[in-house]
Swiss-Prot record:
Residue stretches spanning the membrane: 24-44, 66-86, 108-128, 156-176, 196-216, 234-254, 290-310, 312-332, 361-381, 392-412
Region of interest: Disordered: 422-472
The protein, known as: Na(+)/H(+) antiporter NhaA
Keyword terms: Antiport, Cell membrane, Ion transport, Membrane, Sodium, Sodium transport, Transmembrane, Transmembrane helix, Transport
Organism of origin: Bifidobacterium longum (strain NCC 2705)
GO CC entries: plasma membrane
Amino acid sequence: MATTAGAKKGLWSTIRRIAASDRISGLIMLGFALTGLVLANLPATAHAFETVAETHLFIPYTNLDLPIGHWAQDGLLTIFFLTVGLELKQELTTGSLANPKAAAVPMLCAVGGMIAPPILFLAVTALFSQIGPGEPGTLILTTTGSSIPFSEMSHGWAVPTATDIAFSLAVLALFAKALPGSIRAFLMTLATVDDLLAIILIAVFFSSINAWYWFIGIAVCAAIWAYLVRLKKVPWIAVGIVGILAWIMMFEAGVHPTLAGVLVGLLTPSREMHGELSPRAERYANKLQPFSALLALPIFALFATGVHFESMSPLLLASPLVIALIVALVVGKPLGIITTAWLSTHVGGLKMAKGLRVRDMIPAAVACGIGFTVSFLIASLAYKNAELSAEARFGVLVASLIAAAISGVLLSRQSKRFEKTAAAAAADEEDDESIDGDGIGQPSHTTEPTTPTEHPGTLADGTASVEIDFRH
């Protein structure tokens, strides 16, 4: 019995270590994303995959009757957003966002990184609508050849705004082992604010309010959650029921239900209480991390990229929508971040972290062009047209892979430079210690330094005096 318990504990520890590794969890999610794309387009598996994705599951006495693919997006992804909410609360209280002055540059860079991509996206799609093969003001979908008005295509402006922190950190972990921790801290702060802004975007632009009275229920659930998670002994069954009710009411209200996770996460205490050694928000986020990284995100990625294309060919890369997303994420994201960093430090008078220059952030800024999770979600919310949504998600996947590849090369080179600099500094330090230890450079004999000699004397009034002889 003890052996079984020990084995289970060991297995759970291994799972938590895998989930905590940005590199491994990022590669797992990428693997599921590519698997979804392959399964949806291989003749042998396409029908079975579509059947599973479109199988409906419903909850009695509610309007919840969704296909499995949507349950992955609206249900499972709530675990990820709950983890984000808990981490945000901790960062706002005791983490990188607790001191706005210290975090000012990455916070502003997050804003800049969300402004530039939509501008480039709209510029590229507008250009294609004028010079493309279709009628002026329209764009041609590569997959079906159908004509789409620019006004409809422009609904996807928010798709390239988000950064996938898990993938960005995975790229850093893979290619940037010798980089200073300040670069990772900068990226973490930027991505945290990016997540917050993406949540606001979804709430404001991609929610359709159905009935105001649901918000009363949401507020009641929020208040009960805030009370229950502050009790000395948390009643987890009651907390779970309240969380599920908040999710259902969000759905009924027309707000994207994953935001229920963010709401309750932000209401969780982030300081030590009842004599506990660590904040509850931090502990709960750590416990949820395996479910988020190894369950919710991979399954979501599987169905999000599992879109069927009638003609799966390299011509998809020539799609105006795909090109616009590649330009927006691969060029727009780093351009917005670096431009904002330069303006903040050279014009605004703000300072980067000690030892960091604006140009040091270029490789990490390119990594911020990895969209994935939230970009997939926004693509499915922004486009009601199934073909547009499919091409948008494909564009996000391609753009993210390109951004990951470019940032990987840049980070690897940057890491080698930092490694050489650190090695040279260490060698210089060893040489200095060797010189000091061996006495190299010291004179072969020493002469006693000339010092003044004191001759005490007495003044006429009897006061003691000192006569200093410099001739000695």
